[in-house]
Amino acid sequence: MLDKQTMVTAHNALPGRTTAMSIDDTHFVNGSSLTAAPQSGQQQILIGMGCFWGAERLFWQLDGVISTSVGYSGGFTPNPTYEEVCSGKTGHTEVVRVIFDPERLPLTELLRAFWERHDPTQGMRQGNDRGTQYRSAIYTFSEDQREIAEASKAAYQALLTAQHRPSITTEILPAGAYYFAETYHQQYLAKNPNGYCGLGGTGVCFPPHSTL
């Protein structure tokens, strides 16, 4: 029996399928396209911080975010379903694809929200949500993004260490394939305002007006 908190190997991962999932393309909150590529001057990044319902809402509320969507990344199975991801047999984590304007929302500020609003020290879980699909992750699209992410991780780790907290387990990797989640997961908490939100930070925050 597979331990859902142990990463599956590529050899043992589910085979998936060649056909991509069809989703409604219109963002339920702001009307943007979910599938459009970033336009000139915009950037994208993939963020995993536990259940993607609450994480997506966090980011669509930030000024400077153009669009958000939720999906699966970081694993092996092509075009997985939600049920397959929850089985722990795909290797994917739940992520939010954030398209943002770095002139209005610098990546450092986006990552401030990331570090402060979940617990990045919990390994293959987030709160009561357990499994490799809930691991903390930042998947970057450029070397500049990777360097900023690593620097912000080091800065937040210093704050955690000063308060005798555990080490960060967030994986920071180049972005691989991103597979959109089913339409009912997109902007879930806007469609279901009383729905589940598992976000919960450590209580450790960057000093106000500090730079990462």
Curated annotation (Swiss-Prot):
The alphabetized list of GO BP terms reads: cellular response to oxidative stress; protein modification process
The UniProt entry's GO CC annotations, sorted and at most eight, read: cytoplasm
The alphabetical list of record keywords is: Oxidoreductase
Q: Which InterPro entries match?
A: Met_Sox_Rdtase_MsrA_dom, Met_Sox_Rdtase_MsrA_sf, MsrA_MetSO_reductase
Q: Which GO terms describe its molecular function?
A: L-methionine-(S)-S-oxide reductase activity; peptide-methionine (S)-S-oxide reductase activity
Q: Which residues form the active site?
A: 51
Reactions catalysed, semicolon-separated, are: L-methionyl-[protein] + [thioredoxin]-disulfide + H2O = L-methionyl-(S)-S-oxide-[protein] + [thioredoxin]-dithiol; [thioredoxin]-disulfide + L-methionine + H2O = L-methionine (S)-S-oxide + [thioredoxin]-dithiol
Keyword check for rRNA-binding: no
- Enzyme Commission (EC) number: 1.8.4.11
Q: Does the keyword Oxidoreductase apply?
A: yes
Question: What Gene3D superfamilies does the annotation carry?
Answer: Peptide methionine sulphoxide reductase MsrA
What does the sequence similarity comment in the record state about its family? Belongs to the MsrA Met sulfoxide reductase family.
* Function in brief: Has an important function as a repair enzyme for proteins that have been inactivated by oxidation. Catalyzes the reversible oxidation-reduction of methionine sulfoxide in proteins to methionine.
Name of protein: Peptide methionine sulfoxide reductase MsrA
Organism whose genome encodes this protein: Vibrio cholerae serotype O1 (strain ATCC 39315 / El Tor Inaba N16961)
